[in-house]
Each structure stands twice: as C-alpha cells, then as structure tokens.
C-alpha cells in the first residue's frame, strides 16, 4: 500500500486551500480597504490641522502686528501729550510777554527818570523768554520775511517802496511756536510793493 496521496485525496485539500486563500484574500482586501479609509481620514485630519495651524499663525501674526501698532500709537500719543501739555499754560503767558513789550515801547531808555525801570523790564523779559524757550516756546518775529499764512496773520496790506510785494513790513504783535507748532500767529502788515509806475505818463 502506498503512502502517496491520490488525486482523489488531494482534491479536497486543494479545495480547502483555495477556500482558505480566498478567505485570506478577502480578509486582506477588507483590511486594505479599511486601511485606505483610515489613511484618507488621517489625511483629512492632517489637512484640517494644518489649515487650523495656518489660521492660528495668521491670527497670532495679526495680533502681534496690532499690538506693535498700539504700542507705537501709544508712544506717539504720550510724546505728543508731553510736547503739548504746556500749550494752555504757554497761551496764558503770552499776554504777560506782550505787556512787557508794551512797557518797553512806552518807556524811553534815554530818560534818566525811567531808565532803571526800562532796564529792569528788559532784563525781566529776556529772562522770561529764556525760561519759556527751555520748554519749547519760541518767538516768531517775521519783520522783513516773506508773508507765510501758516505762521502770520495779515492785519492789512500797504504799498511800500522799501519792501517787495508780499513781505512783512511791520509786526504788530509777535507770534509764538510751541515745539514748532503754531501757538499764536504773528499779527503783521504786509507790503504790496512800490507804487505802480504809469507807463503812459
């Protein structure tokens, strides 16, 4: 009796192996399909996470830029407030300076009776102007300068052979700047130039 399997005995084994391979193949296909679905889910989650991260980075960058802008604006506002905090106070001092100038104009420095008063007012005024200049207040005396409507207020215009047209020929009241910003315009008389020459005459 031979121990070799016959074709009849081999057929059920082959069939069982074929079924087992088919089942394994089907199981592998199911696992592969599930793995593909899981990969797609993970890819979608990764894309969503990357988009959320990009959005957060954008929001963070915008917030940082806005914070920097606020800091810059705040520093500028503080600097402006510091520079011009004295504006109201400086405006209150201008009439005092004007009165000292009028006192000097109304006093004769050659008259022995008023010479001491003149010198006292003159020294006081020089000291006062030096003090206010330390805080950014500067006097504008545009005598002989070209008229500038940003810093001068014209009281009137007159013909003058001594001054070219559009030149400040007389300062009625000096102007003032506070840190290069106009505090009060200078009140001026502006020249229209010399008299016109009649060509036909």
From Swiss-Prot:
The name this protein goes by in its record? Protein GrpE
Provide the species name: Shewanella denitrificans (strain OS217 / ATCC BAA-1090 / DSM 15013)
Query: Any idea which GO molecular function terms this record carries?
Result: adenyl-nucleotide exchange factor activity; protein homodimerization activity; protein-folding chaperone binding; unfolded protein binding
Which Gene Ontology cellular-component terms appear in the entry? cytosol
Q: Does the keyword ATP-binding apply?
A: no
One GO biological-process annotation of the entry reads:
protein folding
Gene3D superfamilies recorded: 3.90.20.20, Head domain of nucleotide exchange factor GrpE
Q: Which Pfam families match?
A: GrpE
Asked if Glycoprotein is a keyword of the record, the answer is no
State the protein's purpose. Answer: Participates actively in the response to hyperosmotic and heat shock by preventing the aggregation of stress-denatured proteins, in association with DnaK and GrpE. It is the nucleotide exchange factor for DnaK and may function as a thermosensor. Unfolded proteins bind initially to DnaJ; upon interaction with the DnaJ-bound protein, DnaK hydrolyzes its bound ATP, resulting in the formation of a stable complex. GrpE releases ADP from DnaK; ATP binding to DnaK triggers the release of the substrate protein, thus completing the reaction cycle.
Q: Where does it localize? A: Cytoplasm
Underlying gene: grpE
Protein family membership: Belongs to the GrpE family.
Question: In which domain of life is the source organism classified?
Answer: Bacteria
Q: Which SUPFAM superfamilies match?
A: Coiled-coil domain of nucleotide exchange factor GrpE (SSF58014), Head domain of nucleotide exchange factor GrpE (SSF51064)
What is this organism's lineage?
Bacteria, Pseudomonadati, Pseudomonadota, Gammaproteobacteria, Alteromonadales
Keywords assigned by UniProt? Chaperone, Cytoplasm, Stress response
- Subunit structure, interactors included: Homodimer.
